[in-house]
Amino acid sequence: MVSMLPKADAATGVIRKSYAQLPEVVNVPNLIEMQLQSFVWFQEEGLRELIEEISPIKDFVGNRLELEFIGYEFREPRLSEYECTQRDQTYSVPLYVKARLIVKTTGEIKEPFDLFFGDIPLMTALGTFITSGTERVVVSQLLRSPGVYFTISDDPATGRPLCHTNLIPSRGAWLEFETSNRDVISVKIDGRRKIPVSTLLRAIGYSDDLDILNLFEVIDNDPERHYIQSSIDRDPLIKDEISALIDIYSRLRPGDPPNADNARKLINEMFFDPQHYDLGKVGRYKVNRRLELPSREVGENRALTREDIVAIIQRIIMVNNGQDTPDDIDHLGNRRIRTVGELVQNQFRIGLVRLERVARERMSIVNLEMVTPSALVNIRPVVSAVKEFFGGSQLSQFMDQTNPLAEITNKRRLSAMGPGGLSRERAGFDVRDVHYSHYGRICPIETPEGPNIGLIGSLATYSRINRYGFVETPYRKVYSKLKNNDKKLVGLKLKTEISEKGKVLAAAGSTISEDSFKIISKLPECDISVMPFVSAEVKYMPADEEDRYIIAQANTRLDEKGYFLDDRIEARSAERYVVEPPDKIDYMDVSPKQIFSVAASLIPFLEHDDANRALMGANMQRQAVPLLRAEAPMVATGMEREAARYSGQVIFAKHAGVASSVTSEKIIIRTAEGGHDEYLLKKFVRTNQGTCINQHAIINKGQKIAAGQVLADSSATENGELALGQNCVVAFMSWQGFNYEDAIILSERLVREDAFTSIHITKHELEARDTKLGVEEITRDIPNVGEESLRELDEDGIIRIGAEVGPDDILVGKITPKGETELSAEEKLLRAIFGEKAREVKDTSLRMPHGEWGKVINVRIFSRDSGDDLPARVNKWVQVWVAQKRKVSVGDKLAGRHGNKGVISIIAPVEDMPYLPDGTPVDVVLNPIGVPSRMNLGQILETHLGWAGHLLGFRVATPVFDGADDTVIEDALARSWLSAKAGAIDMSPENKRPSADAHKAIEWIKQQGFDGKKIFDEKHPGLAKEVSLKLWLKDMGVDASALSGAELEKKAYDVSSQSRLPSPIVGKSVLRDGRTGETFDQPVTVGNMYILKLIHLVEDKVHARATGPYSLISQQPLGGKAQFGGQRFGEMEVWAMYAYGTAHNLQEMLTIKSDDIAGRAKAYESIVKGEDVLQPGVPESFKVLVKELQSLGLAVEVINEEVKIAPSEKVSSLNEGNLPASDEISAEILPETLYANTEDISEDSMMSVIDADDQDLVVSSNDEEVSENDERS
């Protein structure tokens, strides 16, 4: 191996060279921690809060009964996760609440009693819920935080900026304050008509004008504008508390007679009673911070106070006068996240409120002597509220399990939609846009492309959620001053000298030793200025706190002790980008990938991709199908291991030990302490999307295992790294026009070697029920089915495991009794005694759907006789899993990680593909036109670096914004060229990958007169490039020994252009056409790219129908593959048929192929008998039209007699006015077919028919002339 190779990873044995320049200061946190912690909070605190809220429940009068809840516990789940998925059950735990009943009339306290409160769905260790057998994820909701918001809007009349304020509680009535251009501040209570703010102040106890003016005299001091006085003058009739209360009451309760006591009670309840008004912990925290109230600590008082309202009005005046800044409602300091625990808590609260209401009603009517807690409490509202949330909420989603990355992303997703959130239609541009406060908190790249763009986001890699629901991101603390007794001073450089009484204790620029620290620490407490340095101390900050600091970028240059190397540092301060000296810097980013989500962090060279394409790349990685032979990327970013670790699909050793047993089903590790760790492997498990999870051990029996080592991989991981696609040799060139419009040319080798083969599993189910007509039976004895169709069924009529099945094959045989009437009790008894004669049964077997095939991999049978818990009237339940091995085919969608996607247009034979000078055919041909306009150059850099890694036999990690630069890539290509020239690369077919012989390459370079060791040493950037160019120019007959740097590159470029041969550092090769053997005109970019096969497979899309189901009303074929529907033939397609004059085709399309019921039946019959298809009849849609016209009150009738087109001679005779007698017409025009064959009618005769029609005469067989004057016309 070449000396530049790093050592293999101890845990996995994988050689991966990292090009990261920056150290990893903070490890990537647990990526699903948000879900897990939130649900634990719900179990431990959220539920306790709810129970304390409703306890105790008293009857309406308050003197009969009192029900107290004094604690709760979760018991053990009834079924395991595995059993729940197999039996379509919900993974849940029973909740029991300890209740104590007090009879007020007698003072009796009954014994505490455990009340069953229903089964609560339980979160699995992977952050998901299993409901009805399917895994679901509760997505976190991003919505405006409770609190007070001051915004500015220009007055339309005067253009003056005026303050508008919203006070949003967690629960209760909104207060909206507005300023008018006449300086009146008014308030709307819960969206009602506005009143001057002075009226509200009087109602809450500030009744006198002087009292109100005194509250604001310090603030409302603008000589031109007097807001409070203007508001008082606005309503001169209201001068005291009672008139103010009555005024507000009459607006809030317009129908009720106003009364001062009722009004006071209403206002107290509305704003000052915690039962009805709750700012919430978050709201109180935000209000205190925004209003800078002295009671800074968030206490228990979460209702509003009079002081809060006064402080809000003071702030409104300050904002109007320009003394305070308005709020940005899209700032992440003003938007919070409701995680799963809070969402479940809110739903649970709804159920408990209903439960409380029912309990209070029962308390009033129940017998006091016989009463028990269970008689008062009805748990149904709680159970149904929770069930409704997990089953029907917009935020409880069917988990995206296409691959491990899709799972993680689903769990880290943030949605601005859902109950209480935004809707697609109402959301404007501002709320969807990237905001500066998203930095390090929400990924600016990953969001859907459709109508949800910007409304659904993804948490950034290092972000976390604090106790108030705000997103925090970590920063490293920068110190430029420390206290003189701080031990961190030891080893630091002083910025200014330290002296005492004129004596210098330590000079500026000197390093503080242990001895000098002892002297300094004895001085009186003071700050010591040191050279600014970045500490290892990490602080997590929410967005509003971060705005107060100046923060340096993660790639700021530091020395090994953490001192800044530059005098001017690029940094951020709120939304400004600044350049500041080091002593002004407060914090520093922890990592360049801190900005991005997991999916975006998996894109190498992300910094070279356009944001739109990066978005597509991040989203398409989630759609990649796990392949049969998982292969980790040649060029990775280093996040692959973290993504695989937290997906839960890779098994890591908990403790060190020795593998005592390794099978395909389980791994047993004997630990050093003598215990045994057992790990069960998942085998061919179907995901929600029909892909396959199949874990397999990657260790051997007897192997020593370290703690944290990878024991087993899954379908989309290799050696503990995410492996979503395949490393392919790609060429960027056009080839026979097959890569037009981003189409992809694929080599047959990839099909033959199953490179892009994936496994897809479908699940089919059948129930045998008790019907009204008798019992359904699962059996092999099916009427009118031949032995050929039954050959794979066992004696019970169930398919055997391993059988290969195709469309319409029977999976489970079942017969259902036929019959029109239900049997009476007597008939049932007689049948039971005397046995049954051969009953009429119909075949209702479970069959493979149209177009599906595969191999049966598992069958499960649940039976009432075996004691299985089945739904009512179900006796037997059979589940069959069928797996398909799908090879890649024309029409499948492939993609890279840079948003470069396309559909396979041709799978060409290996011998026809373009091939390299050493005879290696390329695997994939991509269109070069797809690169410049898309501006995703990351794919080219990946191709080049991948090629160097491929030839030299190592894999690469290049983290986002901290990876390999141009020089590094050129050096890597140069080294691979030098190794190839030295014959040091082993390309033998028995090696899975090429490998390079270090010594051979170094020796050869030495012979050429250069230092081989230096060339393969990373500490000499640019040397390998220079040497390779000199040697290449020498081969080309040019002496370049005296050239270097830009001159050398220029010379190489000129020679390359003239000779049409690529230099070693451009990553191009001369390719030959596999069909002709001739070289292509220009050198072609060839390299190694990681390619994914997406779940949009052609086999799921292509569909054909001969006959099938029809719509009930229109009688036209249904649409869509799922309904086994037909192809829509719309208005525009009809126009196309007109244009080509294809009358008969058009007629068929609109009649027998669509909704002519009789015609299509006859057509089918004719085809079966081999006869000509007769002419069509009247389409059903015509009848629907007639009915619709009749419903409008138009007397439309269909003349139902059949009309025959007369021969041309007859028509001419009619045109001349020779009308036959009525009996002649009857005799001549017999009721034959509706339409005669018109082929033998000449153009003239057709015109004659039209003329006849123009004369308002219709020849019909009902013995009368229909003239213009006739009623019926």
Curated annotation (Swiss-Prot):
A single GO molecular function term of this UniProt record: DNA-directed RNA polymerase activity
EC number(s) given by UniProt: 2.7.7.6
Keywords in alphabetical order: DNA-directed RNA polymerase, Nucleotidyltransferase, Transcription, Transferase
Gene3D superfamilies per UniProt: 2.40.50.100, 3.90.1100.10, DNA-directed RNA polymerase, beta subunit, external 1 domain, DNA-directed RNA polymerase, subunit 2, domain 6, RNA polymerase alpha subunit dimerisation domain, RNA polymerase Rpb2, domain 2
PROSITE patterns cross-referenced by the UniProt entry: RNA_POL_BETA
UniProt feature coiled coil, ranges: none
Region of interest (Disordered), residue spans: 1252-1273
SUPFAM superfamilies for this protein: beta and beta-prime subunits of DNA dependent RNA-polymerase
Name of the top EC class for this enzyme: transferase
Source domain of life: Bacteria
GO CC annotation: DNA-directed RNA polymerase complex
Reaction catalysed by this enzyme: RNA(n) + a ribonucleoside 5'-triphosphate = RNA(n+1) + diphosphate
InterPro entries: DNA-dir_RNA_pol_bsu_ext_1_sf, DNA-dir_RNA_pol_bsu_external_1, DNA-dir_RNA_pol_su2, DNA-dir_RNAP_su2_dom, DNA-dir_RNAP_su2_hyb_sf, RNA_pol_bsu_bac, RNA_pol_bsu_CS, RNA_pol_bsu_protrusion
GO BP field: DNA-templated transcription
PANTHER family: DNA-DIRECTED RNA POLYMERASE I SUBUNIT 2 (PTHR20856)
NCBIfam families, A to Z: PRK00405.1
Family note: Belongs to the RNA polymerase beta chain family.
Subunit field text: The RNAP catalytic core consists of 2 alpha, 1 beta, 1 beta' and 1 omega subunit. When a sigma factor is associated with the core the holoenzyme is formed, which can initiate transcription.
Biological function: DNA-dependent RNA polymerase catalyzes the transcription of DNA into RNA using the four ribonucleoside triphosphates as substrates.
Name recorded for this polypeptide: DNA-directed RNA polymerase subunit beta
